[in-house]
């Protein structure tokens, strides 16, 4: 009979192969030191080259061979040569490598007459400054008088000595420009196109106009140089309207002192209103 109380023999587990213990590699201090030495040496070399380069720069900058001797300024219409040199803040004897061209250009560009400036250095001793000046084509009255250039940009308040021999534009204020810059710029360009057309005419020329008034709701009204008679043009089609005026203007000149206005803003007629 089986002995139920007899313990069963435990199965023998298969012996696992034991891995040999890992052996720690010795630290290669010599390799680490070599790499560290290379990094430190490279940094030292870069630093030394930088210091040497700066030293060479100082020597070159200080040598009399690279001193400013010639200052070239492009031909000017309004500004004076010495004004540009004073704005640039340079003088003969300055070190050529110490000239900061961008800063010089920015200083010159602060003058309202300057629209564009180009500054160049030519070794061993020349500084060149090419200046493009703004040219006024009209005066705009916004409480104060300002010059207006061909792009429709208001660029300078008039001061004592400035010329006034330009057509005067009215009807556009500083508040208009601040509130609606794009619309105001468009209106000014429209007026400038009319001025350009008047300049090109052989009859009823720009000289016969003293003021050009712009009204956002109506358009353009001219005022004659003689007696200040309003000439209502409205908006657009200026060439045809002025052609019609030119045909009768010589006759009207004899009685211009009694005219209240001339209205050209019609397609088929001209209205001449007397006082």
Swiss-Prot record:
- Family the entry assigns: Belongs to the FtsQ/DivIB family. FtsQ subfamily.
Native source organism of the sequence: Geotalea daltonii (strain DSM 22248 / JCM 15807 / FRC-32) (Geobacter daltonii)
What Gene Ontology cellular-component terms does the record carry? cell division site; plasma membrane
Q: Glycoprotein: is it a keyword of this entry?
A: no
Q: What does this protein do?
A: Essential cell division protein.
Predominantly, its location class is membrane
Query: Keywords, A to Z?
Result: Cell cycle, Cell division, Cell inner membrane, Cell membrane, Membrane, Transmembrane, Transmembrane helix
Membrane topology recorded in Swiss-Prot or TrEMBL: Single-pass type II membrane protein
Per the record's keyword annotation, is GTP-binding included, yes or no? Answer: no
Q: Which GO terms describe its biological process?
A: cell septum assembly; FtsZ-dependent cytokinesis
- Topological domain ranges for the Cytoplasmic compartment: 1-38
**Residue ranges crossing the lipid bilayer per the database entry:** 39-61
Record protein name field? Cell division protein FtsQ
Could you tell me which residues belong to the region Disordered? 1-20
Q: Name one Pfam family in it.
A: FtsQ_DivIB_C
Using the record's annotation, list all stretches that form the POTRA domain.
Answer: 66-134
Where in or outside the cell it occurs: the entry states: Cell inner membrane
Which parts of the sequence lie on the Periplasmic side of the lipid bilayer?
Answer: 62-275
């Amino acid at each position: 009979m089986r002995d139920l109380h007899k313990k069963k023999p435990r199965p023998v587990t298969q012996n696992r192969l034991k891995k040999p213990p890992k052996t720690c590699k010795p630290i290669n201090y010599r390799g680490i030191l070599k790499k560290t030495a290379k990094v430190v040496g490279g940094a030292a070399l870069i630093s030394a080259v930088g210091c040497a380069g700066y030293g060479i720069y100082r020597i070159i900058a200080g040598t009399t061979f690279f001193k400013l001797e010639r200052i070239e300024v492009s031909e000017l219409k309004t500004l004076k040569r010495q004004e540009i040199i004073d704005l640039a803040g340079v003088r003969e004897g300055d070190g050529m490598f110490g000239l900061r061209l961008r800063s010089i250009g920015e200083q010159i560009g602060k003058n309202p007459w300057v629209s564009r400036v180009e500054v160049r250095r030519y070794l061993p001793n020349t500084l060149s400054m090419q200046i493009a000046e703004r040219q006024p084509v009209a005066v705009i009255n916004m409480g104060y008088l300002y010059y207006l250039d061909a792009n429709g940009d208001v660029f300078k308040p008039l001061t004592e000595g400035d010329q006034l021999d330009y057509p005067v534009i009215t009807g556009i204020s500083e508040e208009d420009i601040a509130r609606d810059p794009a619309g105001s710029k468009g209106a000014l360009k429209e007026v400038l196109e009319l001025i350009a057309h008047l300049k090109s005419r052989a009859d009823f020329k720009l000289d016969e106009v003293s003021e050009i008034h712009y009204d956002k709701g109506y358009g353009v009204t001219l005022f004659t140089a003689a007696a200040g008679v309003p000439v209502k043009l409205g908006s657009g089609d200026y060439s045809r309207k002025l052609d019609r005026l030119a045909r009768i203007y010589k006759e009207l000149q004899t009685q211009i002192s009694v005219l209240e206005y001339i209205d050209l803003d019609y397609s088929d007629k001209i209205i001449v209103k007397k006082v």
